[in-house]
């Protein structure tokens, strides 16, 4: 079972209201293998559809008709907003799927309150999976009711008919402050005769009942991820006789902006860590810090999960191959676009580098500023002279001399390498110090959470790739699902036509901007592709006061070769 921690709210003096829901805007509801599902997440209050300040992480799952999850993503929410994507692989068979979005906090509500969207996937490469013609979907209407007055938000185009590779000047204008300060996502995608599921507009979503749930003081609740990702687990006594309460546990997420935390277990041996730094390394290390650490083992809780048996799939929603021409066009387009993906690649948003948690108190030794030595013993003797070591029976500890204390305290220092705690520093004896960029030191008693250390010694390598050989039941090394990296989606530019004249352009998705803001410059203009047809411009989102906004417009791209 997943836990997260089912915690009793017995200390609460009043009821707690779970007032949270998710709206997800997807770029389409029918996909061919090789295409990409793009989506924007809005985390909202159920009551009034304004942004929810509670959760900082959302989850998105794609569930097949056998009610098995085939894709799961963790999405970081910034100001209640997030974005992600999923490349549809050829391993997925043709059929009906359900896209589900939720937060930890929403797991306290019934499954019917999770965001659910029907998705069709067509795999033209698995011809033995053709579905019977009797189950053909009827084409759904693409009409949308605007949720705002025409005078409140205007979608302006320079014209309605374009040639291939022509610039489309699209502007969004509003004089309404609530709308101007809202959050929106914009999709421009080709329409064809392949049947689709009805997309859920923000307007429609706002009319769907979403209940608030009241938890009383005696309820057990799944905790919300208030500050960031929540990593939880349990310390187990291998003999069953060692205490499991108040056991000190450390968490290391190594890397450039590393995370290091220390907590103590509760009466059940449970612990929780919360990650709020921009470090997307999936490799984590959790350790018991105790003289009797070998008496314990560590188990990690599974990710939050939904009961897929409660999901209802629409009847008769299989696609047939009577739409061969359109399916072939889509399949060929995706193949060509994927072949030239290196010329139209999306960019990852640059991550901000954050200083270590101890930065304001540490003394830095940048080793290039000194004569370099190959070994640790030489380096601490000649450079970081405050540090000394003690060895005994294959165990080595580093200590930091504190001139204000005599005699020196026997406790060792906290030793980190790129954020990874080394309780036994024997690995460093044979490590080439030429790989170390700098050493940070703190002299004197230093607290990390509830644990005090006699100083700190932190080694920062050039490549941030230090690997420890230490293992045991009290050291858990594992990989976890991390949030998707935020992308800046590629927007093809034909300002200079000659630059890309020889590159084919078979885009069916002309623009995807998941972060449209009316109160500042946002990318809303775009260029058409070489694919003729009708395209739908679709804007979804919510005004600052929770008013849903759903606007649609159509444009036509003419086949230049036939003009």
For the regions a language model picked out, list residue spans one by one.
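Extracytoplasmic beta-strand/coil segments of soluble accessory domains associated
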Residues: 378-415, 447-448, 456-460
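Bacterial Sec-dependent N-terminal signal peptides
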Residues: 1-18, 172, 563
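Short strand-edge motifs at loop-to-beta-strand transitions and within beta-strands
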Residues: 82-86, 269-273, 524
């Amino acid at each position: 079972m997943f836990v997260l921690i089912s915690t009793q709210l017995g200390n609460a003096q009043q009821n707690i209201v779970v007032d949270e829901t998710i709206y997800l805007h997807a770029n389409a509801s029918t996909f061919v293998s090789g295409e990409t599902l793009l989506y924007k997440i809005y985390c909202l209050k159920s009551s009034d559809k304004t942004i929810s300040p509670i959760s900082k992480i959302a989850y998105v799952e794609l569930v097949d008709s056998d009610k098995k999850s085939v894709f799961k993503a963790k999405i970081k929410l910034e100001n209640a907003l997030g974005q992600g994507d999923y490349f549809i692989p050829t391993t997925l068979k043709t059929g009906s799927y359900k896209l589900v979005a939720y937060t930890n906090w929403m797991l306290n509500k019934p499954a019917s309150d999770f965001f659910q969207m029907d998705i069709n996937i067509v795999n033209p490469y698995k011809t033995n999976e053709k579905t019977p013609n009797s189950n053909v979907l009827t084409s759904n209407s693409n009409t949308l009711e605007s949720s705002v007055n025409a005078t409140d938000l205007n979608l302006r185009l320079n014209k309605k008919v374009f040639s291939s590779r022509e610039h489309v000047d699209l502007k969004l204008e509003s004089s309404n402050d609530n709308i101007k300060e809202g959050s929106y996502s914009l999709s421009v995608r080709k329409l064809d005769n392949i049947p689709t599921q009805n997309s859920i507009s923000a307007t429609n979503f706002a009319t769907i009942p979403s209940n608030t749930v009241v938890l009383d003081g005696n309820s057990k609740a799944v905790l919300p991820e208030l500050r960031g990702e929540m990593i939880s687990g349990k310390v187990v006594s291998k003999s069953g006789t060692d205490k499991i309460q108040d056991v000190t546990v450390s968490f290391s997420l190594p890397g450039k902006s590393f995370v290091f935390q220390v907590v103590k277990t509760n009466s059940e041996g449970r612990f929780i860590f919360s990650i709020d730094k921009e470090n997307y390394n999936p490799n984590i290390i959790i350790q018991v810090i105790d003289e009797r650490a070998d008496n314990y083992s560590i188990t990690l809780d599974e990710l939050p999960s939904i009961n897929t048996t409660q999901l209802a799939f629409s009847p008769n929603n299989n696609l047939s191959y009577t739409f061969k021409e359109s399916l072939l066009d889509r399949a060929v387009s995706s193949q060509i676009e994927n072949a030239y993906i290196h010329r139209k690649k999306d960019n990852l948003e640059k991550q901000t580098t954050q200083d270590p948690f101890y930065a304001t108190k540490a003394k830095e030794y940048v080793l290039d500023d000194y004569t370099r030595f190959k070994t640790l013993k030489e380096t601490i003797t000649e450079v970081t002279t405050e540090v000394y070591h003690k060895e005994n029976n294959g165990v080595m500890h580093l200590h930091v001399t504190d001139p204000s204390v005599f005699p020196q305290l026997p406790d060792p220092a906290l030793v980190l390498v790129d954020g990874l705690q080394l309780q036994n520093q024997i690995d460093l004896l044979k490590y080439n110090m030429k790989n170390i960029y700098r050493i940070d030191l703190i002299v004197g008693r230093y607290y990390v959470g509830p644990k005090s250390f006699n100083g700190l010694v932190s080694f920062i390598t050039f490549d941030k790739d230090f690997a420890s050989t230490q293992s045991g039941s009290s050291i858990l090394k594992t990989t976890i699902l991390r949030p998707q990296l935020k992308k800046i989606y590629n927007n093809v530019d034909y300002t200079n036509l000659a630059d890309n004249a020889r590159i084919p352009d078979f885009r069916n998705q002309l623009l995807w901007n998941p972060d449209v803001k009316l109160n500042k410059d946002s990318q809303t203009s775009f260029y058409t592709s070489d694919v003729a047809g009708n395209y739908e411009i679709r804007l979804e989102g919510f005004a600052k006061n929770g008013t849903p906004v759903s606007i649609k417009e159509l444009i036509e791209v003419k086949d230049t070769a036939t003009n």
